[in-house]
Amino acid sequence: MAIAGIATGATKGYVYTRSEYPHAIATMSEAVEIARAAGILGPSVMGSAHAFEIEIRSGAGAYVCGEETSLLNSLEGKRGTVRAKPPLPALQGFLGRPTVVNNVISLASVPVIMERGAEFYRDFGMGRSRGTIPIQIAGNVKHGGLFETAFGLTLGQIIDDIGGGTATGRPVKAVQVGGPLGAYFPRQLFDTPFDYEAFAER
């Protein structure tokens, strides 16, 4: 986030997380203090002329706050409802000021790209969906949990190879992709690549 802040001329960033995740909030708060003590945050980032600070904010956990303008309303202490666009947050966002809104996946990709280069990052994935993505596998599977993989694996590979198939040994009839507002994919669509464009086509 500090890199993104310096790149855009921002001096402060906010990490917005749901109040239902106290361990994540505590971990992030500790990480901010460590970064501040190491000079990565503060009035002179890494000894440079750039200042950047991070504040952790917790929200009430409304699902709609995953949408950027609703998130901004919540950050401002308002009800988490979607704002009309335009104006876009890049022009008029948090407290009416130009605002960059990124998810943690985008921000986590920045150091890898800066260290290894864009071509290295582009080697992972397919089409317009490049790099890696964290996926959570839950339910009747042998190996549930959080995994990081490149875009492009099929749903079948994710369920059968990474997840190990079902814990009960019964055949998989369908999987839900994308959380509460996602879609169900039957077994006959398990050849679908884990890729934004491929999902949009299905």
Predicted regions and their residues:
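Internal alpha/beta scaffold segment
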Residues: 2-24, 108, 114
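Short amphipathic, charge-patterned alpha-helical segments
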Residues: 2-4, 150-168
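Short, flexible, solvent-exposed loop/turn segments with mixed acidic/basic and small polar residues
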Residues: 3-5, 136-138, 200-201
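Terminal amphipathic helices with adjacent charged low-complexity linkers/tails
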Residues: 12-32, 54, 167-201
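Generic beta-strand/beta-sheet core signal
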Residues: 16-18, 57, 138-140, 149-150, ...
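Hydrophobic alpha-helical positions that pack around
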Residues: 25-151, 163-166
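Short, intrinsically disordered, charge-balanced linker/junction segments flanking boundaries
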Residues: 100-101, 107, 195-202
